[in-house]
Amino acid sequence: MKILLAALTSSFMLVGCTPRIEVAAPKEPITINMNVKIEHEIIIKADKDVEELLETRSDLF
């Protein structure tokens, strides 16, 4: 009887010591700061005839 009582007591103590993992959402929202600088350049190459047309007819663009 004492052995059974000791076994039950020790098993209850061991069950109480098992690790528990808890996953919970954070209280504050997650913020991601991205400092991105985007630069682009458009290069247009035109023939001389097209350049003259663009100079004379500036209303095209």
UniProtKB/Swiss-Prot annotation:
Keyword Membrane (UniProt): yes
Pfam families with a match to the protein in the record: Lipoprotein_19
Compartment(s) of residence: Cell outer membrane
Lipidation (N-palmitoyl cysteine): 17
Lipid-binding residues (covalent, S-diacylglycerol cysteine): 17
Effect of a null allele: The deletion mutant does not show any growth or outer membrane permeability defects.
Signal peptide: 1-16
Record's keyword terms, sorted: Cell outer membrane, Lipoprotein, Membrane, Palmitate, Signal
Similarity-based family: Belongs to the lipoprotein YnbE family.
Subunit structure: Forms multimers. Interacts with the C-terminal region of the probable phospholipid transport protein YdbH.
Function according to Swiss-Prot or TrEMBL: Involved in outer membrane lipid homeostasis. Interacts with the inner membrane protein YdbH to form a functional protein bridge connecting the inner and outer membranes of the cell. Is required for YdbH's function and may facilitate phospholipid transport through the periplasm.
Name this protein carries in UniProt: Outer membrane lipoprotein YnbE
